[in-house]
Amino acid sequence: MFSRDLTLARYDAELFAAMEQEAQRQEEHIELIASENYTSPAVMEAQGSVLTNKYAEGYPHKRYYGGCEYVDIVEQLAIDRAKQLFGADYANVQPHAGSQANAAVYLALLSAGDTILGMSLAHGGHLTHGASVSSSGKLYNAVQYGIDANGLIDYDEVERLAVEHKPKMIVAGFSAYSQVLDFARFRAIADKVGAYLFVDMAHVAGLVAAGVYPNPVPFADVVTTTTHKTLRGPRGGLILARANEEIEKKLNSAVFPSAQGGPLEHVIAAKAVCFKEALQPEFKTYQQQVLKNAQSMAQVFLDRGFDVVSGGTQNHLFLLSLIKQDITGKDADAALGRAFITVNKNSVPNDPRSPFVTSGLRIGTPAVTTRGFKEAECRELAGWICDILENMGDESVVDGVREKVKAICAKFPVYGN
């Protein structure tokens, strides 16, 4: 029998110490990685619940194990809330991650060797959209589209590639693109060549849920997302679709048993909490602020003479090109890290440097907005980043910014009492 008195701190002090150090880092550092956010205590409580003990292969009311009557309730809550949140007719909440959700979509609708048309990783796409190092680029014939000299998707070029290569699936989505996707145009192109339209909205799902970014569900055959990032839930995946019995059956079979075994019901419970939070009015206010904060930061960089890819942002992130300053993304990332500002180095269009070095930074505002930052704080923060980038090698500037970061983090804690 287990005793609830035997806490992790008592049982495994070494592990607990590392976790406490991470908690301290999150409180004392400013998080600007666009794909990161902070979950609520309720989300973490669900994910750390007794549901982790239960195997539940199959789907609600169609399980291969007994004793699933209560996890059926949990999973159905998550399904119903996801459908309500995004206006979908179908939702599969079982994918363990966004990449696995994407893999399931490919398994469901494609055969090995089929052609897919997706956004180039070098231009802001994602590994799973046909990059050569990903299974999506190895199992399928991946054709890539990119952005033009203005940093925008050239839809005429997308259409030309679609007509030329006749893809079975067109993938719309990104990991580093700061503008709004034209889902209606993607739909028209897909229809012209008889392709499925698959939208990966992992980065903007929270904005979509709040009505701050267009909803792809009415246009796409299938939509996937992660449940963290802007959605502010646990790490996991989600598949959505409009009513289509044939596609729904294929998607369910692709997730289980093709791609996964038993679902993680404790994570699904946390997803259900996240979806409930996203249905509240305050979530819309939060997402509106995420966008305002990103735009405020981007403008500071422009005013200070830095290059922002595509000239600004219409979502939660933007790419800062440091080619003109002859600063590598790797060095900028490290310098900011010493100032307790966490970003990620990122390739920029036509980057002359390798993906391990890069010439840019990707900056996002979901996490700082969760802390309570508004435009004033974000403008100040962007100014501190500029100070460091304009004085690379001057550790006194880094030291000064670090003290300012610690002070503002104390003023805006992630988890209050």
Curated annotation (Swiss-Prot):
Family matches, as HAMAP family: SHMT (MF_00051)
Pathway(s) of this molecule: One-carbon metabolism; tetrahydrofolate interconversion; Amino-acid biosynthesis; glycine biosynthesis; glycine from L-serine: step 1/1
Record Gene3D superfamilies: Aspartate Aminotransferase, domain 1, Type I PLP-dependent aspartate aminotransferase-like (Major domain)
GO molecular function, one term: pyridoxal phosphate binding
Cofactor annotation: pyridoxal 5'-phosphate
Species assigned in the record: Pseudomonas aeruginosa (strain ATCC 15692 / DSM 22644 / CIP 104116 / JCM 14847 / LMG 12228 / 1C / PRS 101 / PAO1)
Gene that specifies this protein: glyA3
Enzyme Commission number(s): 2.1.2.1
The keyword Transferase appears for this protein: yes
Positions with a binding annotation for (6S)-5,6,7,8-tetrahydrofolate: 121, 125-127, 354-356
Entry keyword Amino-acid biosynthesis: yes
Sites of N6-(pyridoxal phosphate)lysine modification: 229
Cellular component GO terms, alphabetical: cytoplasm; cytosol
Subcellular location: Cytoplasm
Single biological process term from Gene Ontology: tetrahydrofolate interconversion
Protein name per UniProt: Serine hydroxymethyltransferase 3
Highest taxon of source: Bacteria
Quaternary structure and partners: Homodimer.
Stored PANTHER family: SERINE HYDROXYMETHYLTRANSFERASE
Catalysed conversion reaction: (6R)-5,10-methylene-5,6,7,8-tetrahydrofolate + glycine + H2O = (6S)-5,6,7,8-tetrahydrofolate + L-serine
Site feature location: Plays an important role in substrate specificity: 228
